[in-house]
Amino acid sequence: MKKTLLWMLAAILTCSGLTTTLTSCKDYDDDETIEVKEYFTSWNKCEALTALKEYVEDVTNPKSPNYISPEDRIATFDMDGTFVGELYPSYFEYNLLEYRVLDDATYRDKAPDDVREAAQAIRDFVRNGKALPDHFDMIHAQAAAKAYAGMTLAQFDAYVKAYAARPANGFTGMTYGQSFYKPMLEVFDYLKANGFTYYVVSGSDRFICRSLVESIGIPSNRVIGMDVKLVSSKQGEEAGVNYTMGQKEDLIRTDELIIKNLKTNKVLQISQEIGKVPVLSFGNSSGDQAMHNYCLSNDKYRSAAFMLIADDEARDHANREKALNLGQKWNAAGYHVISMRDDFKTIYGLGVQKVEFTF
């Protein structure tokens, strides 16, 4: 009798939906289907999307010879221009340094000459079209290290988020902190649902990246970027190996650049921090080629690499001719090309429109 009551109770719970979230307790006709989440609603049908879905379906199928176990489903994503805007009018971290050095009343009078020169080069580039100096990625990195030196990590996070809350220059209906490519966020959702772990591997400052992607649920321990040396707030000049940090000390940014995370440095950081070769890689520039090639050299698993091209002059501040030339280059290198103009139904979402820059 007790067994009968237990079975009846289990049936009632099942029918009430407490033990399942997929169906109610009923028979389905042959033509009825269970609702499944639809991904990629912001995409048009295109080669790149077809290739991505075919790849994921293959490597997640236990019966496939290309099956990849979940712990090895590693995907790496560049940030600027790959899933975050970079044409408003330049990289977020370039805009931030320009503001910090030339407009922020709390710092502009303190900026060293070389930092001021770097910020002015950015302003001349975005406002007057003057070419940036050679090797400006390193010039900027060294200037940025100095410009934010002395800030605690909490102070820097708040500073980045305050600037990110400003309206994105060249657009209406969007702040810098909202400037994510909606179709690429759907890629994150799709990969997560299929057992992939994805990492941000950016040339931008690691802590800037962390502040920006927090809002879309990417944890800070899956963010790799440019690094500066940190010290404890009471450490002074003593080496970390000799100093014991106390319980109520903060971590402070210094002016010492450790690494600019571009090109082969991305590969080195992936190896050191992730410890596995990615099977999927997404980027948009030559700074991502080494990461892509590392992924495609994976001799254990089938792999794939994707490059976005900024070819949409109607919805973004793009250079279509330059983008198409890059697309040919990426195709020749064996990467799948994602056209923002042809493949995306929307870039930033409804209500966002491109307008002229204002300075």
Cite the ranges covered by each PLM segment.
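Short, flexible segments with low predicted structural confidence
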Residues: 4-5, 127-128, 263-264
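Bacterial Sec-dependent N-terminal signal peptides
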Residues: 15-35
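Alpha-helical substrate-recognition element adjacent to the catalytic core
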Residues: 32-239
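C-terminal cap/substrate-recognition subdomain and adjoining C-terminal extension
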Residues: 32-40, 154-359
